[in-house]
Each structure stands twice: as C-alpha cells, then as structure tokens.
Amino acid sequence: MAALLFAFYLFDMTYVKVKVYHKTGYGFKGKFKRLPRALRNFKPERDVYFYLFTEHNTHQGHRIYPEKPSSLFISHFDFNKDVKILIHGWKNTGNSTFGRTVKDAYISQMGVNVIVVDWHKLSILAYHRSCRHMDMVAVRVAILYDFLRQYVARRAIHIIGHSLGAHVAGIAGEVVQRGKIYRITGLDPAGPMISKIRTHGRLDKEDAEFVDVIHTSGFMLGFYSPLGHADFYPNKGTPIQPGCGVDVVGRCSHRRSYHLFQESIFNSSEFMALQCQNWKHFVKNKCFPTWHRMGEHIQYGIEGKFFLRTARKSPFDVGYTTDLKSRVHNLTTISNKTV
C-alpha cells in the first residue's frame, strides 16, 4: 500500500522550471522546483496579480506590472503617499472580505495607496500545496516591493498579510534586494504545516525592521508562538473568540484578526494592550504596567507579548479608562459580561 501511495505521489509530481527564480536573481537554491501537475501551468509572473486602489478608484483596481513601469505611471498612484500591500490567505482571493474591508478602511480613513495581491490560482488548491509553494508568490511580492522602492521611500511601504499571506510577506522579506522591509503586520499567521518551521520559510522578526502580529486562533488555524517584535493576543489569542459561537475549527476566530485590525485603522486610541508574560498573569493582574496600541497605529519599535480583551461584536474595543487599576478592573468586568 505504501509503495502504491509513493507511486501515485511521483505520478502527481513533475519538474517545472520556475523562470522567475533564476531569471531575476530572486529566490532560493536551485533553478528547478518540484511542482504538482495541478500547477504545471502556473506562472507566478502571469498568475499573481497586483491591483492598485486609491481615492480615485476605490472599487475598480488598476493592475500593476512590476516589469512595466508605465502601468504605475498611468494609474492613480500617488507618489507622495504611503503604500499598503495586502496579501490574502488560503482559499481566499484579492476580492475576499479581508482585502475589501481593510482596503476600504485605509482609503476612507488615510487616503493611501493600497495594492491588493491576488494569488487565488494557488491559494484555492489543497492547503498543503498552497503552503509548499507560497514561496513563488513571495518572490513576486519581493519583485513588487523592489519595483516600488525605485519611486517611494522604504518607510512608506507597509505589508499586511492574513493567514498564509502573513508568511508570504515574511518570505518576501527574506529575498528583497532594495533594503529591508520597514514593517510587516501578520494577522493570525497560519499555523498548520508551518509551526515546525524554525525561521526561513515563514514570518519571523528578521523579515522586516518591525514585525507586529495579532494572534486570534492559535493552536488551531493560527500560529500561537511569538513571531514578531510585538505579538498581540486578544482574548488569549486562541479560539473561541468572543461572539464566535461554537467555531469548531476556528474559522471565525481566524477572521477576527483582520476585523480587529480594520477597526484599529479608524481610531488611534483603541485596542490598548498590556505587556505581560502570559494570559494567566494577565487575568491575575500580574503584568508590567505597560500599555500599547494594537493594530495600525502601533508604537514603532516596541517588543514583547501583549494581551487584551475585546467585545463580542463590532465595535470590538471595550473602551476602558486611562487609569491602570481601573483599566484592568474594567477589562475584567466587561469581558465577563461579553465572553
């Protein structure tokens, strides 16, 4: 039986040259990559899409081609504004809820350039295949980053990835050639098949000058261990997140990360989290008296693990007071009513 399965595995695999790796100088060892037959026609330079959205085109994205600078010049790209790059996760597309909600929040609140990465031709496959070959998407993101760096400052570019998209961002950070990425935000980075990987091939704090992470479905769909400089754990960072009902596999909790992040864009004073060693200490008020914002308006350069509670539904911020003792008391009181 084992021999039969191995034979099927060999039949299902074929060597496909991924030209983008050796042609551009990006990527990893070897110029051949073993790909399943389902991906033999997948070409990253053709099948990974970059759509630009701005205040002038909020609903219809303009496709950007890193190899064609004119595609940027004829768009509504504002060279004086920041750039937010959004990378979706498994079984999603560029038009899924994550991309739409976060993109709309950025444009309406901050008026920035938003580039949505759409890699659905790979992300719709079985999870193990999407996971094994997401490095091809990461190389394309790295090429996009280096292309943009010719026209905007390094500090102007911020990459946000959800689920597998967070690891795509991290791998891109390993191979960029025009300076280290300034900031990467991981929204509940995927855990399955990745939690055993040490550093390379997943998101970690070496992939950008500053990496912040929001964990909401650790030990299930998400990665629980710290991955960045600053790791935030709303409601312990595990399922079931408040308001998610049964949530057997953690899907609702997995999505909660980008809903919290989307809300953080609108208010720079929300989602204050307490630096703490672990959740048990947080609940018992045995933490450092150090509070920091979670989300878009995070204080750059902070390090550590941070814990907070959120409400069952939007608005998720619990709105506690500024006094430290009152904060902890209010957090506990409000959470007991909502969880």
Question: Each PLM stretch: what is its role?
Answer:
Residues 183-193, 213-218, 237:
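Active-site nucleophile loop of the alpha/beta-hydrolase fold
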Residues 151-163:
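Alpha/beta-hydrolase fold nucleophile elbow
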Residues 160-172:
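Glycine-rich nucleophile elbow surrounding the catalytic serine of serine-hydrolase chemistry
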Residues 171-173, 181-184, 222:
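Tubulin/FtsZ superfamily GTPase core signature
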Residues 121-123, 191:
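Alpha/beta-hydrolase active-site loop signature
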Residues 1-116, 123-133, 142-154, 177-179, ...:
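Flexible, membrane-associating and regulatory peripheral segments of lipid-active enzymes
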Residues 87-89, 162, 188:
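The conserved beta1-alpha1 loop
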Residues 210-214, 231:
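Catalytic His-Asp charge-relay segment
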